[in-house]
Amino acid sequence: MRIRRKRLLKNFQKTTGCDTIVTFEPENLFYLTGFWGEAIGILEKNGNTTIIAPELEVGRAKDESTDCNVIKSDRGVSSLGTLKKFLKGKVCTDCQNYSMMQSLRKSFPKIKNSIEPFYRSREIKDEKEIMLLKKGSKIIDDMFGICAKKSRLGRKNQNSNLF
């Protein structure tokens, strides 16, 4: 599944002329690498995938990711310095942070910001993923049922004694 998603992102790279795709969002990082955490994911034109992670996340990133280089970096803005070393040519990103985008635009004025390719790649679901989604939905439904039994309509929160 991850290979198929990566192929879709590479097709996006080809059609838009992006040399590098960068993800800051944990869910997009997960679908690209298999690692969910505080890190930056990079997909290069040649298909190489790199994770830039803070020191506390590096070990887990190495354990949980698939076919990725993992680079240690400081957190926050200083991670952009590490990121900029990897970026060449036209860059596409899902970055939602205004100050980070401003910093990236200084080095890469033609940077393209779009979450569309990540959404498109996440539309694909296999049987395993569908089973996990069903299991998660059931857990949420069960939790809602427990909360509904504990709380009563018309009672104040302080009197409902949920926990």
Which role does the model predict for each range below?
Residues 1-51, 85, 106, 145:
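Terminal domain-start leader segments
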Residues 18, 67-68, 88, 108:
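Short, well-ordered alpha-helix to beta-strand connector turns
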Residues 26, 53-60, 95-101:
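Short, polar loop motifs at secondary-structure junctions
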Residues 16, 20, 40, 60-62, ...:
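Generic hydrophobic/packing signal
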Residues 47-51, 68-69, 88-92:
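Hydrophobic beta-strand segments of well-ordered beta-sheets in folded domains
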Residues 4-6, 75-163:
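Flexible, acidic/His-enriched mid-domain "rim/lid" segments that flank
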Residues 52-79:
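Compact, glycine/acidic-enriched structural inserts
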